[in-house]
From Swiss-Prot:
<keyword id="KW-0150">Chloroplast</keyword>
<comment type="similarity">
    <text>Belongs to the PsbN family.</text>
</comment>
<dbReference type="InterPro" id="IPR003398">
    <property type="entry name" value="PSII_PsbN"/>
</dbReference>
<dbReference type="GO" id="GO:0009535">
    <property type="term" value="C:chloroplast thylakoid membrane"/>
</dbReference>
<protein>
    <recommendedName>
        <fullName>Protein PsbN</fullName>
    </recommendedName>
</protein>
<dbReference type="Pfam" id="PF02468">
    <property type="entry name" value="PsbN"/>
</dbReference>
<keyword id="KW-1133">Transmembrane helix</keyword>
<keyword id="KW-0812">Transmembrane</keyword>
<feature type="transmembrane region" description="Helical">
    <location>
        <begin position="7"/>
        <end position="24"/>
    </location>
</feature>
<dbReference type="GO" id="GO:0015979">
    <property type="term" value="P:photosynthesis"/>
</dbReference>
<keyword id="KW-0934">Plastid</keyword>
<keyword id="KW-0793">Thylakoid</keyword>
<comment type="function">
    <text>May play a role in photosystem I and II biogenesis.</text>
</comment>
<keyword id="KW-0472">Membrane</keyword>
Length: 43
């Protein structure tokens, strides 16, 4: 394989991994530990 193909595949894999981790943090089990600033400051 060419170098450009390997670089493109590795960058794509990194972006997909980061997106998956962000979705897991936002909606998965760790989301229970996140605080909601809008609920804390009711006006």
């Amino acid at each position: 394989m060419e170098t450009a193909t390997l670089v493109a595949i590795s960058i794509s894999r990194s972006l997909v991994s980061f997106t998956g981790y962000a979705l897991y943090t936002a909606f998965g089990q760790p989301s229970e530990q996140l605080r909601d600033p809008f609920e804390e400051h009711e006006d």
